């Protein structure tokens, strides 16, 4: 099977999978689902309450998973991501998330519009992504939203 294996097998990942499953089962899927639903609602309601935020995806939080993508009007995603990280140590993903065709579609960009950035020095189009997990709390979501309010101001300085 060597020719079908790309790189070193993820032995640690395989070993830790069983432990992860045990933890999830001990907590209970119903509790995890309820937690994620509450966190999604808090996050989406907070983002929707900011007029300069553009969210992407289904507007009904019950039809979503714990991943929320958005942009801040008139501020590049790199800038917001960097400000969050440098100001409060909040790390979120930004860019196209290895899903270029989908992001391009959500941003309503044609292939030729998007490809002109490939060999240019212009900032590339993309989005900001918050991923919620079992370990997140409502307080962390509120801290994120409060910090986002600060760092999205055009005159924000560290």
Show where each model-derived region lies.
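Pyridoxal 5′-phosphate
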Residues: 1-158
């Amino acid at each position: 099977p060597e020719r079908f294996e790309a790189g070193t097998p993820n032995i640690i990942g395989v070993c830790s999978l069983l432990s992860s499953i045990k933890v999830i089962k001990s907590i209970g899927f119903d509790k995890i689902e309820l937690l994620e639903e509450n966190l999604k609602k808090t996050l989406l309601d907070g983002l929707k309450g900011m007029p300069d935020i553009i969210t992407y995806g289904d507007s009904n939080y019950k039809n979503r998973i714990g991943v929320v993508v958005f942009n801040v009007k008139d501020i590049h995603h790199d800038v917001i991501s960097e400000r969050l990280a440098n100001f409060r140590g909040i790390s979120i993903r930004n860019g196209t998330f290895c899903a270029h065709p989908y992001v391009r579609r959500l941003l309503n960009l044609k292939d030729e519009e998007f490809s002109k950035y490939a060999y240019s020095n212009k900032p590339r189009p993309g989005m900001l992504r918050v991923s919620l997990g079992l370990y997140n709390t409502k307080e962390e979501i509120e801290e994120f939203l409060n910090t986002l309010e600060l760092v999205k101001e055009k005159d924000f300085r560290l």
